[in-house]
Amino acid sequence: MSMKRPQDHSKQEMAARIIQKAWKTFLNVSVFQHFKSLIDLRRQGEPRQIVKYINPKEAELLDAAAGVQVRFRLGGVKFPPEIYYKIFTHRHIEDLCANSPRDYTKLPARYASHNKDDPPQVEDNSGWYRRIENNGWRPVSNRFWMPTENEVLESTKESEFHFSKLKRKQDLEKKRKIKKIEWMRQMYYLGSLEAKVTDRETLVLIHKATKGLIKSIEDGGVDSVMEWEVDEVLNWTNTLNFDDYIASWRETATSNSSAYLKDAKLQRIQKSLQRKIYEDETKESEEKIYYDGDFYENVYIKPLL
């Protein structure tokens, strides 16, 4: 019986680890591709019908007139990932915070409101124009009647809602500018910023401009640079357009909007009404021709001289 040396055992163990690692990688990639194929949507499907299979109670509250759209994403703290969904509305809906900005959770008690002896208290406006978005990313689970513990923190995120439309527009532009800057900074430090030109002098100038812009942002903050400067650097240094990337990302794993979908029952009612109107108009025109006709059978006509 031949005796194996310790070196042979170590080589076999190393080879086994390599095979096991490769097999585990293959399984993980296959599982991820499977989960990715489950949400492989791009403006497809009716939102209410999709939510009906996820959460039937919530599907009853969806209104097609609100322009509902459902998005899916993969997430979680462990592997395999979980599928999360979120409902978006792309039309104006009635919001109590927009009409009544007061924080009704901190109203004074009834006994204090009728107390005329004490001087009136100064009303605290600290909680006004602030809302808590309860529409966060929720995991897709077949236990829709039970509360899920793996709720993401974004559902309780507090955001400020300014009364001025101009201020809200400025805040939105600032958020978009911050996203572009973070995009450029991350690609710069990862070495993914590649210039479109091949001229050596132009490459040096682009590299210096990018480095100077990054340094200005780190020293003076986001407000130290303009948005058009960031756009210029991104246009010169990268072949991937940021706006196109964001637009494509928003359409990935997304259902169709209910604003572009028509109910089958409503279509049948509209067709029946149009058919009835057409039949009534046809019948009315035929009756008009019948009664407006000239009949001379029993009429005496005087001969011409």
Curated annotation (Swiss-Prot):
Q: Which UniProt keywords apply?
A: Cytoplasm, Membrane, Mitochondrion, Mitochondrion outer membrane
Is the Membrane keyword given for this protein? Answer: yes
Q: Where in the cell is it found?
A: Cytoplasm, Cytosol; Mitochondrion outer membrane
Q: Which GO terms describe its cellular component?
A: cytosol; mitochondrial outer membrane
Just give the chief location class: cytoplasm
Q: List the disulfide bonds.
A: none
Q: Give any single GO term for biological process.
A: negative regulation of protein targeting to mitochondrion
Q: Which PANTHER family match?
A: NADH DEHYDROGENASE (UBIQUINONE) 1 BETA SUBCOMPLEX, 4 (PTHR33504), PROTEIN MFI (PTHR33504:SF2)
Please give the function described in this protein's UniProt entry: Acts as an inhibitor of mitochondrial fission. Interacts with MFF and prevents DNM1L recruitment to mitochondria, promoting a more fused mitochondrial network.
What is the protein's quaternary organization?
Can homodimerize. Interacts with MFF; the interaction inhibits MFF interaction with DNM1L.
Mind telling me what this protein is named? Protein MFI
